[in-house]
């Protein structure tokens, strides 16, 4: 299912990818959590929502996602988002 979700994502079929990533994320899949973060960060198939993006990346990071860790570090170093936490 992850492969299918990533294929949809890479082909800009975000509406098809979203429910697959959500299901996988609920099951604890860190890569799906990372992709959900990207979708919310960029507004791909969903409304842009930095808070949701950060929350998905935090969850993915706790499960060992280096991509999510990178995004969190990037956001932290370029924005004041974390100043309110």
Task: Give each language-model segment a name.
Residues 9, 18-19:
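Extended, folded domain segments that form the structural surfaces/walls around functional sites
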